[in-house]
Amino acid sequence: MHGSATDPLVYPHPTTPQPGELTEVAPGIQWLRLALPFQLNHVNIYLIAHEGGWAVVDTGIGDDKTKTTWDNVFNGPLKGTKITKLIITHSHPDHLGLASWLVDRAKCQLVMSQTEYFNGMYFNSRRTEGQIADQADFYRRHGIGEE
């Protein structure tokens, strides 16, 4: 069942979850939508049943709002459930941003490619005043406010 590039999008799930709400999209797969503070206003995170707990795919951005959302998920629908591993798909900050925090909190294994790991480390280490100003300008141009 393949369409053409001009066919309308077909969404496999009838509703979009609210930010911070877990939604089962298939047996053993949960969808978690996390808010982002820019024009692209969310990132999709997935939890896959694994070894009696959940393997988490990506983390959301590294800010306090996202940490609070994760805390609510851990204290609500995932209460008493183990996170078995964290899988990072790529080193963009909305996918990798809370990796260290989540691994520390869940005491789980981190899984990601070596290339993406080094990309993330490289961009995180380049914190000069000029680089921070360049990043701030980039994010402003893409819809993030001054705060």
Predicted regions span which residues?
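Amphipathic, soluble alpha/beta structural segments
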Residues: 14-15, 100
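Charged, low-complexity surface patches
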Residues: 14, 37, 91-92
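Active-site HxH/HxHxD metal-binding segment of metal-dependent hydrolases
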Residues: 71, 75-147
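Conserved beta-strand hairpin/beta-sheet module of binuclear metal-dependent hydrolase folds
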Residues: 19-81
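A generic secondary-structure micro-motif detector
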Residues: 10, 60, 88-89
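N-terminal presequences and immediately downstream first alpha-helices
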Residues: 1-14
